[in-house]
Amino acid sequence: MSVSQPRWRFDGIAKVTGAAQYGADFSIERIAYGVPVLSKIAKGRIRSFDLRAAREISGLVEIITPSNALRLPNRGVHPEMKDAPQIAMLQDDLVHYNGQVIALVLAETLEAAQYMASLVKAEYHADTAECDFESKVSSAVPPKDGGNTSQYRRGDIEGAFSRSEVRVDEIYATPVQHHNPMEPHATVAHWQGDRLTLYEPSQWIVFVRTCIATWFGIPEANIRVLGPYVGGGFGGKGALWSHSPLAVMRPKCSDAP
């Protein structure tokens, strides 16, 4: 760190002038735009879809639901996370959480895809979701995965409290906060024969390649992940999110990139 001397970021000028090319900026001929449809319940099953209104809009390419989605050979995502619970998108009718991807609308323009996605309706068999942490913490199961110790104990807390002259017992809460980078999450997937190129805003492109290869049963040598710029990450671009495998899945279900 220098004092009174400017420090130039390697990518700073490109980002502040708009010259930086992010993942969603890469254009491919005949590209289709995908927008997910999200669940409105926290737990249960999907009974049925009503796609009629969405299908009436001009520019529709395809609507992917669990009934017509590409069957994935693997539900694991990464070898180091083999013991973690896996949720394979669009592979069954189960709903595990509110906001889960339950369908994908593809259209010739982004605006059309967004509008069509808003018209897709789903009916559910809703189950009771366990959302109260305090009442269920006693039955929590320690995670087995991740390669790190999940439970720590250090020192004698109760002993320290008993010896303290003053003890403050209070509950503090903070509002929900979200990292909001200049580059939103988006992925462009381009199939050329059996080779895949992903334009991906990622802080860990090797992880993305390994996950996609594992999930889809593709040799890693056939996958190229490109992320020349990352428009802010804050850790949110250090993992694999749903839009990436959905973009990879989509071209296998239709003939457009």
Task: Give the location of each predicted region.
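Flexible, low-hydrophobicity surface segments
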Residues: M1-G146, R167, H243, C253
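Short, surface-exposed connector motifs at secondary-structure boundaries
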Residues: Y33, H96-Y97, H190-T197, V230-G231, ...
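Phosphate/pyrophosphate-binding loops at sites that engage ATP/ADP/AMP, CoA/4′-phosphopantetheine
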Residues: A53, R209-V225
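Beta-strand segments within the central parallel beta-sheet cores of soluble alpha/beta enzyme folds
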Residues: T65-P66, N222-P228, D255-P257
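Short acidic, glycine/serine/threonine-rich loops at helix termini
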Residues: P73-H78, M116-L119, P201, R209-C211, ...
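Helix-loop-helix module between adjacent transmembrane segments
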Residues: R154-G155, D194-L196, S202, V230-G238
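Conserved beta-alpha junction segments in alpha/beta enzyme cores
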Residues: I157-F216
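Thiamine diphosphate
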Residues: G233-S254
